Amino acid sequence: MIHYHAIITGRVQGVGFRYFVQGEAVNRGMKGWVRNTDEGHVELKVEGEQQEVLDFLKTVRKGSPFSKVTDMQMEQLPEFAHYQDFRIKG
């Protein structure tokens, strides 16, 4: 199991990007959350099996049909939050 935090920048608000992220996460059995930030970015935290999480993050980096991801900063977190599901916050 691994736990990641990511900040995604680009055209990621107002284009259904959080719903895209949630759908990808749920389809892959990931746990965590995604939300818009006040700065116009999208933030997420995700937990799951290592390869599944890494594949999920690659898909998020590619973006949805209506989004345009220009940057994605990621960090692996040392502790687990034991999320129950994957939800959209805020």
UniProtKB/Swiss-Prot annotation:
Keywords: Hydrolase. NCBIfam families: PRK14420.1. Pfam families: Acylphosphatase. This is Acylphosphatase. It comes from the Bacteria. It is an enzyme of class 3 (hydrolase). The gene is acyP. The active site is at R18, N36. GO terms for molecular function: acylphosphatase activity. The keyword Hydrolase applies. Its EC number is 3.6.1.7. It comes from Bacillus pumilus (strain SAFR-032). Residues 3-90 form the Acylphosphatase-like domain. It catalyses: an acyl phosphate + H2O = a carboxylate + phosphate + H(+). Belongs to the acylphosphatase family. InterPro entries: Acylphosphatase, Acylphosphatase-like_dom, Acylphosphatase-like_dom_sf, Acylphosphatase_CS.
